[in-house]
């Protein structure tokens, strides 16, 4: 349990009051996510993380991360409903028994052995990730449309095997989603995503479920970052960024699914293309004249009853007026062999090459894990895994400490969602 300061305690009391109100008899919805474990590396003490978005996350994570979601329908009458949703998140390095938000500090010494600085860190970070109300049935012509306001994860698109979010505009805001328009579904939202102390609002428009051919559909998206600077900030801000997204989803592809994504963006969103950003939290001071694009393909297939294979392929480029291009190409593959309903052997290999303003970098990772899960599906969780990973950096001889361009991780991890 986290030690509670006054603000944390007040928040907890508020949440509890909402969800246990005697005037509402519906059960509380309880969902969550957790990853945690223990591991060591060859040269760096505990297990290390190396470019996990580019080479894959299996056996390549060094944290304890959890999300706890509580939700409750507060009203349901005459086809109208109101639902309150909340989520708290906790992040730590998992190094101790009692990890809280109390700050721990250490004195730092210079080369002469004299104390000349202090470094302070929290054992754990606690965050409010979602707190919103979603209302359904308020639009008579669109009874399935959802009107919402508050802070929320907003229609996030990611690749699980690398934890790469390529379209994620989450934040505080408001909108209407799932409007039936033509043959598809329209969603409109505005979300606040400040850049430091500069106010930025992301206008998000999506049109989904556009039928293409059998078992295939298209989603289109437009994001516009409106920089709302003060008079004093006008000299330091750049141009408003925009991002266009097209995602084709195909079901029943060799027993699985496949997604192909095309994205084009300008200004600070353009910078995020090769930077593997998600189209949120733009840098309002970013240099003008940036264009970026990326092409992504990812999916999971089941070629036989005993094998499932996940993959991602990403190519991205960002062009600047003031410097040379930033480009990246990466591939991650995760094959899984199922021994029975609960035991599997999982492999993951990843490789990337990158050039950023004429600076080259590249690396790879290979992991083998023996795992036990609640079911045989690629997506079955909870999953307990024992893993060994080999990491290699091809450009930096000191990537893992002085004179070390390779490293290994050995560890045990659990991953669960519910």
From Swiss-Prot:
It catalyses: beta-maltose(in) = beta-maltose(out). Residues 1-26 form the signal peptide. CDD domains: Maltoporin-like. One of its GO terms (biological process) is monoatomic ion transport. One of its GO terms (cellular component) is cell outer membrane. Belongs to the porin LamB (TC 1.B.3) family. PANTHER family: CRYPTIC OUTER MEMBRANE PORIN BGLH-RELATED. This is Maltoporin.
